[in-house]
């Protein structure tokens, strides 16, 4: 027994389609977090733990003078604690082969990287390969929601102007 009621309405389908369009339209640079909390390779894992707690993060890029050297995750911190080596350096535990995104990349490309690589964050590099941001799935969600909100506000403004234009036309005719 199938229901005659569709799974989603036409309006809902249009909204889903718009989200997909935005994933192709928006760039990583438009949705990323610009203020990057980063670590230095010579910091100890204890210092990294303090930074993670202070900024309430679960991972951070490792950089020197804006050049990405690696990435450290909460899993790396846990491993150092388990090993009893919390006083070793970030360089000893970081992942050196880092998957990154470019500021100019489309959001859809970053989404594909997240799905394919099972990672929690992407360091974002500029055209000179300097660290300029960090991208999480939450950043993408917030960016898409903000873009949808902007679309909605633009549509409302158009409707408002159109209704007033119609009123102006009607009032001009009544004075003729």
Where do the protein language model's features map onto the residues?
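Tandem CBS (Cystathionine beta-synthase) repeat/Bateman regulatory domains
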Residues: 1-176
